[in-house]
A protein has these predicted regions:
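Amphipathic, positively biased hydrophobic alpha-helical segments used for protein targeting
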Residues: 19, 23, 48, 98, ...
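Sparse recognition of residues in long alpha-helices and their boundaries
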Residues: 52-53, 98, 139
């Protein structure tokens, strides 16, 4: 059973995690989101029924809305920064994508509405990893223009 809970640390999230055997922590590579995720991980390790009985919850991290270019410019945290802060096994990296917004607006999962999109593939790969398959991790790369490829920097 997969139960989605609200973002942040509110009553809904606390109720959802109380009897969890496993958790997928979904975070954006932004300081406030990672900070909330860190608090949730702490609660998973202390406030759940399993934690109170001395057992650990199987935790996975899903990083969404990742943009390598923005991370490179320091506008968001890098994947390594997020992993260092949260110390949780990485399930997948979902790239920032207009396909997700379009799919959401029509009420369809991006994995069905645009299976070839980077986000659609990344979600499908994360689901396969969650089921135990060994799937190579794809890290979304910054799209580079001709001048960037030739000179190794952003074109003005």
């Amino acid at each position: 059973v997969i139960c989605a809970s609200p973002a942040g640390i509110e009553r809904g999230a606390i109720l959802a995690m109380r009897y969890a055997d496993a958790a997928i922590i979904v975070t954006n590579p932004e300081v406030s989101s990672v900070r909330d995720s860190d608090r949730i991980i702490g609660m998973l390790d202390s406030k759940t029924e399993r934690a109170e009985n001395g057992s650990r919850i199987d935790k996975h991290l899903l990083i969404t809305r990742y943009d390598a270019g923005r991370a490179q410019r320091g506008e968001m945290l890098s994947i390594d920064d997020v992993l260092e802060i949260l110390s949780t096994p990485l399930l997948g990296i979902i790239p920032e994508s207009q396909d997700v917004l379009r799919a959401s607006n029509v009420g369809a999962p991006v994995t069905l509405s645009n299976q070839l999109s980077g986000a659609g593939r990344a979600y499908a790969e994360a689901a396969r990893r969650l089921q135990g398959e060994s799937v190579a991790m794809t890290v979304p790369n910054q799209k580079r223009g001709l001048f960037d490829k030739l000179f190794g920097r952003r074109a003005a």
